[in-house]
Amino acid sequence: MLTWVIRVCFLILGGTTGVFSLPALWVKLGIGHILLINNPYTDALIGALIFYLITFWAVKYVEAALNWLEEKLAKIAIATLVYGGLGLFVGLVIAFFASNALSQTNIPLLNSVVPVILTLVLGYLGFRIGISRRNEFGNFVNNRNAKKRTPEEEKTEEKSKKTYKILDTSVIIDGRIADILTTGFLDGTVVIPLFVLAELQHIADSSDTLKRTRGRRGLDILNRIQKEDAIQVEMYEGDFEDTPEVDSKLVKLAKVMGGIVVTNDYNLNKVCEFQNVPVLNINDLANAVKPVVLPGEKMTVLMVKDGKEHNQGVAYLDDGTMIVVEDGRKFINETIQVEVTSVLQTSAGRMIFAKPS
């Protein structure tokens, strides 16, 4: 279908070009007086035929270019296209009025070359400004609409915004998010950005065995989440091409959608907090449901290896919590009773420090 559309466009372009260009050629060739040749119908037919023959060579290149453009546009968010188009329109309108003013002058350079340059430059600047300032324009429109809403409507909208849970790559690979969503601890719509899916696919195609296993596990987790009827899943097909890092794209997406980033990445957690973006770290949830351990409490553990510091030993609880035991190196591969001295709690996890009792 696309091939025939391209050929029809070439036919129309060829016919138009023939009507406007061939009469001058006939005059130069000395056959302009022959009405059978020098008439609009013959010119259009010859031009259309020439351009149609060109399509047999050019159609594949035009089709490839259109497919490439379609693929690029499909990755751009609708808001980006809308604001970019508005910026382009404003730029072209300004260029139109400026060109009209310049065309009144008698200076050849100003009334011929400069208007073309102005159209190109102002159109491009308008498009770029529209894209780069789309968030500010969106916030401006939202603020104006917010003044017209009642407090009840604002609360309802704020609640609906916060229901978007945007998953990052690390939390998908981790796998625990599937169980959390299934149990209903997280409400709202789960958003899977296309750029996160692309990163997962890239990891799954890695030559490194460990990375490949992690990537495939992440894809399996996504399929499991999508098949759950109780979980609302949306794919975000937009992209932020000016931002190469996936983490930065997630932060921008959360700002645009008004959603919450769900992660277990400590660094992304801190970046979101710094930029005032709501974030849920499932490590915080995991730590919250772990049994509370207080200094002075005694427990029985199996010493499995030595620690980083001198004479330290390392043991683990059943939930995976690391216990660093002072002077515990000599008890490796032995089950001993220890006394808790302190507990270190962070978003990255929990660590218990103890000594032999």
UniProtKB/Swiss-Prot annotation:
Pfam families listed in its UniProt record: PIN
Keywords linked to the UniProt accession: Hydrolase, Magnesium, Metal-binding, Nuclease
Domain TRAM stretches: 292-353
Domain PINc: 166-278
Cited Gene3D superfamilies: 5'-nuclease (3.40.50.1010)
Cofactor(s) named in the record: Mg(2+)
EC number: 3.1.-.-
MF terms in GO: metal ion binding; nuclease activity
UniProt-listed InterPro entries: Nucleic_acid_metab_PIN/TRAM (IPR052041), PIN-like_dom_sf (IPR029060), PIN_dom (IPR002716), TRAM_dom (IPR002792)
Binding-site list for Mg(2+): D229, D247
Keyword Metal-binding attached: yes
Function: An RNase.
Protein family: Belongs to the ycf81 family. In the central section; belongs to the PINc/VapC protein family.
Name of protein: Uncharacterized PIN and TRAM-domain containing protein Lmo0234
Organism of derivation: Listeria monocytogenes serovar 1/2a (strain ATCC BAA-679 / EGD-e)
Lineage: Bacteria, Bacillati, Bacillota, Bacilli, Bacillales
